[in-house]
Amino acid sequence: MLTFHGWYTNGRDFQKWFKMEDHVEGAAFTVYPDSKGPTWDVVGNTDLDFTADVIDALTNAYCIDRTHVFALGFSYGGKLVHHLGCKRPDLVRAISVGDGSWQEETGCRPLPVLVTHRTRDDDELPAWGRNAAQRWAKVNGCSDVPEESDAAHGCVAYRGCKAPTTVTFCEDRHFDPTWPKEWNHTIREEYRSLTWSWFNRVP
C-alpha cells in the first residue's frame, strides 16, 4: 500500500502520524514515499513516473504482487492519488483519498475508488470530496444517485458501476469541540481502519 502525504511534509513524518501498518497488521507492505519538493505534481507525469519507479524498486526487492498495489492519499497527496488513478490505473488495483479534492481531468479509466472526507474540514471542503466521488462515478459508469451502504460511517455507494469497479463516499461527521481547528483536516483512525478493510474487499 502506497501512502502519500500532504504538502510541506514527508513520508517519515506522515508514517509517524498515520501508522497505517497498525491497521494492515502484517498483511501488506506499507510504503510512504517522499515528494521531491514541498508538494506533488498533480497535473503532469513527474510523480506518476516516480510512482512507477517506486513500484518497480519494491517488486525487485521484495515478493510483491503487482496486481495488488493500492494507493492511499491524504490532502494534497489525495490529489496525486486521484491523478494517479485517472492516468495510470495500470499501476494500482484501487485508490482511496481522504480530504483531498480533484481537479477536473479527462481521459480517465475506471477503477475502484473510495473517498472519505471530514464534515468539519475547512481546508478541503466536504463538497469537494463529494464532487470527486461523483466524478469517479461518472468515469466508472455508475448511477448518479448513491445509496446508503454503511450508516455508522456515513458511507454511500454508487451502484451499477462497470465491473469490477466501485465508488464509495464516506463522510466523517465526528466533531470534538476541544480539538484545534486544524485537527479537523485529517483521516481519523477509525477511517484509516475502514480504508484498509475496503481495500481488502476490492475484487
Residue ranges of each PLM-predicted region?
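Extracytoplasmic/secreted cell-surface and envelope-processing proteins
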Residues: 11-13, 39-42, 78, 104-107, ...
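Gly/Ser-rich "nucleophile elbow"/oxyanion-hole loop immediately N-terminal to the catalytic nucleophile
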Residues: 41-76, 86-91
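Active-site machinery of serine-nucleophile hydrolases
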Residues: 4-60, 152-162, 166-169
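C-terminal catalytic histidine-bearing segment of alpha/beta-hydrolase fold enzymes
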Residues: 114-116, 127-130, 139-203
